Amino acid sequence: MGDIFHIPVLLEDVINLVETIYLDDGFVFVDCTLGEGGHSKAVLSKYQNINVIGIERDDVVLNRAKESLVEFSKRISYSNTWFDDFFCKYSLHRRFNFILADLGISMFHYKVAGRGFSFLEDEKLDMRLFPSDGGISAYDIVNTFDKEMLENLIYELGGEYYSRRIVKAILEYRKINKIQTSRELQRIICKAYPNVKFKINPATKTFQALRIYVNDELDRLKRSLPLWIANLSKNGILAIITFHSLEDKIVKEFFKGLTKDKYCILTKKPITSSFKEKQYNNASRSAKLRAVKKLYE
């Protein structure tokens, strides 16, 4: 199958949450963002009577997961769709004991997909998780959006303080050439930045903003939260792993708005990765896990 690129984040913490409500019969775990199957594989390995539903829109990644999880084929079913679409179409003939959504982008997309997710690779700007779905690409955005649209996008979705500098540089560059690749865009951004050292690459926030916009990440999350809650069984848990403050704020505010006598927030503060996990899994540095339990049928 080739190398597995993605190490599941906060895996031990997810397992600990499952442990608090595990039932030996009929327990169903829904992995809304299956990826290469890391969380699901750990759950299936530890609990012999758990059944898993794995949801993954990218059919290339889904096939990699199926190969990795082949030994559990009798206890896992797959859905090749977006997680919000799955729950919109799902009929409530049964509810689920545990729903997990890891909102991070798979390492496969950064390292192999060739769609311009990473500024460390010289790839055509795209950033669509599933290009055949159509929709706007990062290439379209940086080459066609006007000044105000670009500034708002980069500032609001990336939290980029230097959004105006960056947009000015983008507009100047595209007077002469189209911005074709991720490395090309990264160079434009870096030249626009002040000549001082920063903790992160100057392109990080702009690339985040483009990816969020292209894949409708925040609105998809907002649509999904009430669907996830509605599909939990009594004492079921919804666990969500976020990777930036915009996602985390949406989840935090949604949980706070739930009726206290019907739901119990299990994470007064989000769970973050341990020092040890940060050492072997760099992707876990910004991960935050929030979880809520449903108290009624």
Curated annotation (Swiss-Prot):
Q: Where in the cell is it found?
A: Cytoplasm
Q: What is this protein called?
A: Ribosomal RNA small subunit methyltransferase H
Principal subcellular localisation of the protein: cytoplasm
Keyword hit for tRNA processing: no
* Role summary: Specifically methylates the N4 position of cytidine in position 1402 (C1402) of 16S rRNA.
| Species | Borrelia recurrentis (strain A1)
According to the UniProt record, what class of enzyme is this? transferase
Listed binding positions for S-adenosyl-L-methionine are G37, G38, H39, E56, F87, D102, H109
